[in-house]
């Protein structure tokens, strides 16, 4: 019961600057990711210049909120600010439809059945949503970018509103996504 609130409160505290989480290397020693060959290989293979992370293992060459958010964490660790911004901007434009503050990111984007490109599944994925919050909060703190911190807090509010339910006998629980997941009826 308190684990969920602990995680959400921790993310909020990180975002507000009241708590910090070590990334594993300080900013000065990270450079721009050029000294992390595996990050560079991932970027070259999976990330388009506009910030879209492509899953080449899928027929639709789709992108997911998980791929975008995990890549943002790796960009943060690599201190690759340019790539981080590209990843976030692509996510906001395509997974959020430029509606940060009113919806959570769609979990899947790619080639639709009719051949057009766009959101394939608009449902959210709470694991990715929390990684977005973490990456944004830490980027706001490390790079002194208050807009990232604000974006993290905005997403956190939506996570609590859209993905947390009160389960009788258990208390607040984080669902895997915004819709399509059964909960125990209230008695």
Identify what each model region corresponds to.
Residues 67-83, 90-93, 130-145:
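Well-ordered alpha-helical scaffold segments within catalytic/enzyme domains
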Residues 87, 101-143, 148:
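Long, hydrophobic/aromatic-enriched structural stretches that serve as scaffold segments
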């Amino acid at each position: 019961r308190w684990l969920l609130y602990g995680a959400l409160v921790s993310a909020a505290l990180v975002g507000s600057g009241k708590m910090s989480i070590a990334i594993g290397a300080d900013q000065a020693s990270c450079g721009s990711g050029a000294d992390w060959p595996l990050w560079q290989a991932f970027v070259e293979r999976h990330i388009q210049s506009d910030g879209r992370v492509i899953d080449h293992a899928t027929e639709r060459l789709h992108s997911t909120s998980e791929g975008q958010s995990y890549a943002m964490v790796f960009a943060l660790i690599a201190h690759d600010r340019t790539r981080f911004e590209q990843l976030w901007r692509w996510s906001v434009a395509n997974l959020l439809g430029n509606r940060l503050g009113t919806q959570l990111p769609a979990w899947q984007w790619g080639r639709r059945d009719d051949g057009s490109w766009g959101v394939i599944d608009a449902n959210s994925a709470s694991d990715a949503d929390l990684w977005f919050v973490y990456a944004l909060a830490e980027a706001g703190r490390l790079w002194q970018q208050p807009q990232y911190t604000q974006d993290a807090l905005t997403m956190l509010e939506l996570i609590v509103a859209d993905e947390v339910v009160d389960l009788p006998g258990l208390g607040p629980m984080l669902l895997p996504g915004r819709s399509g997941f059964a909960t125990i009826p209230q008695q």
